[in-house]
């Protein structure tokens, strides 16, 4: 069991149950999955770009991502149907907790001019999204070996019913919110 998962079961879950007055431990919000998505629009011109994005995301997540393809052709963007346009990976269980631990403790503090993450990026149903501008904030990515700086979206899906419950959950996991 990872450090963060153990911390959730021993400290976070009982605290949230007391704070929100849940009758059952199954009502307590928990993180169900973390989805990492990297959109690579340059892949239209150069097919090798998608391979670099896949290798970067594999290093970051510790799991091979699936290549996302376009659903329909759009002439204005010069894309055809089934063109590889990005990659995504879904983390659950132990890998998810280990990734979140690395994200909060190592990666986010390495962001340039970091003052905390926005407390307004909740979707109204208890899920949270973080946009990362550069993949080099993760220690697994070596600066000398990357071909271009790429951003990625991190979606944290929880079982929380409201944004307040989700924010309390993520704050308990020591996410550095600025507001």
UniProtKB/Swiss-Prot annotation:
Keywords: Ribonucleoprotein, Ribosomal protein, RNA-binding, rRNA-binding, tRNA-binding. InterPro entries: Ribosomal_uL5 (IPR002132), Ribosomal_uL5_bac-type (IPR020930), Ribosomal_uL5_C (IPR031309), Ribosomal_uL5_CS (IPR020929), Ribosomal_uL5_dom_sf (IPR022803), Ribosomal_uL5_N (IPR031310). Signal peptide: none annotated. It comes from the Bacteria. PROSITE patterns: RIBOSOMAL_L5. One of its GO terms (biological process) is translation. Pfam families: Ribosomal_L5, Ribosomal_L5_C. GO terms for molecular function: rRNA binding; structural constituent of ribosome; tRNA binding. One of its GO terms (cellular component) is ribosome. Part of the 50S ribosomal subunit; part of the 5S rRNA/L5/L18/L25 subcomplex. Contacts the 5S rRNA and the P site tRNA. Forms a bridge to the 30S subunit in the 70S ribosome. NCBIfam families: PRK00010.1 (NF000585). This is one of the proteins that bind and probably mediate the attachment of the 5S RNA into the large ribosomal subunit, where it forms part of the central protuberance. In the 70S ribosome it contacts protein S13 of the 30S subunit (bridge B1b), connecting the 2 subunits; this bridge is implicated in subunit movement. Contacts the P site tRNA; the 5S rRNA and some of its associated proteins might help stabilize positioning of ribosome-bound tRNAs. HAMAP family: Ribosomal_uL5_B. Belongs to the universal ribosomal protein uL5 family. This is Large ribosomal subunit protein uL5. The lineage of its organism: Bacteria, Pseudomonadati, Pseudomonadota, Betaproteobacteria, Burkholderiales. The gene is rplE.
